[in-house]
Amino acid sequence: MISVFCPHCGIKYELDDEWNGKRVECSECNTRFTIDVKPKKPETVTVAEATPRSYHQGSSKWITCPHCWKRFDFKDINYISRHLDLLGDPILGDDAQRRFLPVKFSGHGMAIDERGMECPDMACPHCHLKIPESVVDLPCSIFSIVGAPSCGKSYLLTTMLWQVRKCLPKYFEFNLGDVDASFNSVINEYESLLFMNNNPDRIVALPKTELQGSGYTNQIMMNGFPVDLPKPFIFALTPKTAHPRYESGRKELERNIILYDNAGEHFQPGHESVNNLATNHLAFSDGIIFVYDPLRDNRMQDFCDKTDPQYRQEAVNQLALFHEMASRVRKFSGIQASDKYRQPLIVAIAKFDVLRESMGIDPAADGYLKYDEEKLEYALDLQCISNISFLLREKLLDIAPEFVGAAESFSETVYFIPVSAFGGSPKIIGSPDAPAGGSRKQALGVVPSQIKPFWVEVPFLLHLYLHGLLPAVASGPAGAQPIEHYKFTQDTIVFSFPGTKARHELPKAYWGMSLLCLEDKRYYVIPTPGGDGPAKSCQATSLDEQIDSDFWNKQ
């Protein structure tokens, strides 16, 4: 027998020797790895002369650092010294307070440094960067935001979080708050600039996300050379007392939400290096939001509002960037080329205000919500979201079919969501009379009082639903007709709408939904393999339940 530890979650397996050298998948975190050695259990350090807090006691607890993504036993966690004589850290540099493994604790349960000062702040034993206490206490859900340079990721992230912070307590009995203001200082500054500005009628602009810099990365010394790590945005998702599952499932609902926003250049081919691990978080993500900019695609520009000052910007090969992202996910996660990514991919079609009229897709601002008057509860309207995703997907198949194919070949669960961070066009700073589409690069901004975000919160809310944190319903419209001519092939249904000859292919995310046929403007129910018709409601369930988690028991 050999003892094997998953390199991601640390769970231990006892296997026969014949498994040595084979590639397997962890039943807990779905990480694929090759069994080629007999890993040693990580050494632990016993804390002596201590009166520890409750989580110092008991069995080991494994933690994933949100900075370097290495796992470690909580017994090995470092603390950040506070005495000024202890300035200088071998990993963070001369200006950082020294990190240390404590041997003494105060009566308050705080570590005591060499000079006798209480030290409440913890740090990763590998990268020495600060770890919030909530990362120790609560599980973490990681989401990555990817997009081309200048696609508006920073604006989208800021407005998305602003809307989500309002939407969750209002409709879903959740709060989303900062766990430590130092981690989210950039986002908080952006929110203040856009939504709490003392001069809301004056044009403002957010700075571009840089490849490096104190606001976006942390530089550490790793293996003798400097390495840049992205700064995570960390929030605590907690249910309110009015949440229907507060008493029965509070522990399952509470968690950290960790977001990463990289400069678009980080995802361009050739920008990956051992000195910059900015995109390694993709291997640990529970979902990806890919921001697709129609104004950086020459083919889609023909459908965009030509009066927008961003019209005819220099095109970017966003397909190549997507393939580079997918390649890194596979490489970092150990996913084979023939396998699909098992976490959801939400493609956010940004700046949709320039496409809304030409594409004829204009859902209500709150159309993604469904209210149950009897239960007095809100849920995501999965029927509406799926139908909008389908209509947008149909348009993209006419304009950029290769991108749709790439997205659905990469991930098992893909949605296409129209979003607009501003709800309208930005303004030209300092040159109001400059012609749109000019050759000179223009500085653009936005008037805070005119910001009307559209569906920016939906990608985030959809991720929460897909991971079992929000409820959803999928009741189709009355009079939806069945589809008679169809067949199932692997994870795809091939069909044609009644009275049409056009062939359609849809992945299983759309099965059971009532979708609008663009030719006759009628709704039709997409069949399911069991033939049960559309799902009447969808309780919030984890994606883990859709995955074969009994791998080890079957062998």
Language model features by range: what are they?
Residues 8-32, 36-134:
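Long, basic/Gly/Ser/Thr-rich N-terminal segments
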Residues 36-47, 484-488, 530-555:
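Short, intrinsically disordered terminal segments enriched in charged and Pro/Gly residues
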